[in-house]
Amino acid sequence: MRRTPLYESHVSLGAKMIDFAGWEMPLQYTSINDEVATVRKNVALFDVSHMGEIFVEGEDTVEFVDYLLTNSFKNLRIGQVMYTVMCNEMGGIIDDLLTYRFGEKQAMLVVNAANIEKDFDWIVNQSKQFNVTVRNLSDQYGLIAVQGPLSERFLKTFVSDIDSLSYYTFASYSVFGKNCIVSRTGYTGEDGFEIYCHWDDTFTVWNELLQRGNNFGVKPAGLGARDVCRLEASYMLYGNDMDETTTPLEVGLSWVVKFDKDFIGKDSLIKQKELGLQKRIRGLEISDRRIARHGMYVFKGEKRVGVVTSGTFSPTLEKPVALAMLSSEIKISDEIEVDIRGSKVKAMIVKLPFYRGSVKSS
């Protein structure tokens, strides 16, 4: 199992460690609910160094990345970040990712940890007709997410001009004397920043953040809290809510699909749009405190209408919530049932997101 540069710190902080995509990662330090509360009310630090960084460089960078991804990279300004998906020819989602535009000839694609090798191979294979070089530099970067409504106020105490960074933009900063890329991005639904450090600098930056954060109430948070926060904010998780058998139109990501340009999978998505969706992701609020988990079936009367893709108890909303891939006949406010360990539990279809936090609008 692989370890991030912060492994020793996680162990010394008493983290419960788990295997996540072949990485030994912290699930929680204290309790998941406490860590979620820290994210929602103050500032939490996450180690997300297991994420992948793939660089595309060369004369055709803009043209190639624009073709590779569903969202419009050509329209992205230098210093901007873009959320997007990468599809196969059938419109199935290979991965969802963040794309950073460094210039006319360089882009960074930040991909999910479980998909690094798959994504890299796909990108290399698609690049052969373009004048670009594709490099997997995941081993050279650590990544720390600083998340919560007070993130800017905290970081401003040692990075003076951090408030000039608007939502979904990035810049180079000196953080505790280390050269870092900092973006105003995150996966929690709160305002926040992600700090890309050289692998060997990550431990120093993390430790300084923890020490400076002592008087600020800043605490580390694990993957458990990260998953609850993203689900409350209704952010999709690759491998649970979407994969190569689902399209961006089915999982509520039509806003990252730009049909006015060419991209891999465009023809298939146009056809799906014209024919109409057979299934789509919906939000569920469960009637009692039982949790609907991934893989549990959803019923409307006696008819099975779909399956739960993600579910948890939301400490912020004080009720269980879930995402489910359901037949398109199921609408907002419909009452349905989830088969939870052999008993059918009532639930209602609700509008997403479940929770809106302090995340800045673009």
Curated annotation (Swiss-Prot):
Keywords: Aminotransferase, Transferase
Catalyzed chemical reaction(s): N(6)-[(R)-S(8)-aminomethyldihydrolipoyl]-L-lysyl-[protein] + (6S)-5,6,7,8-tetrahydrofolate = N(6)-[(R)-dihydrolipoyl]-L-lysyl-[protein] + (6R)-5,10-methylene-5,6,7,8-tetrahydrofolate + NH4(+)
GO biological process terms, semicolon-separated: glycine decarboxylation via glycine cleavage system
GO MF terms, alphabetically ordered: aminomethyltransferase activity; transaminase activity
Record Pfam families: GCV_T (PF01571), GCV_T_C (PF08669)
Highest taxon above the source species: Bacteria
EC id: 2.1.2.10
Keyword DNA repair among UniProt keywords: no
Record's GO cellular component terms: cytosol; glycine cleavage complex
Function: The glycine cleavage system catalyzes the degradation of glycine.
Protein family (similarity comment): Belongs to the GcvT family.
Complex and partners: The glycine cleavage system is composed of four proteins: P, T, L and H.
HAMAP family in the cross-refs: GcvT
Protein name, per record: Aminomethyltransferase
The species this protein was found in: Pseudothermotoga lettingae (strain ATCC BAA-301 / DSM 14385 / NBRC 107922 / TMO) (Thermotoga lettingae)
Lineage: Bacteria, Thermotogati, Thermotogota, Thermotogae, Thermotogales
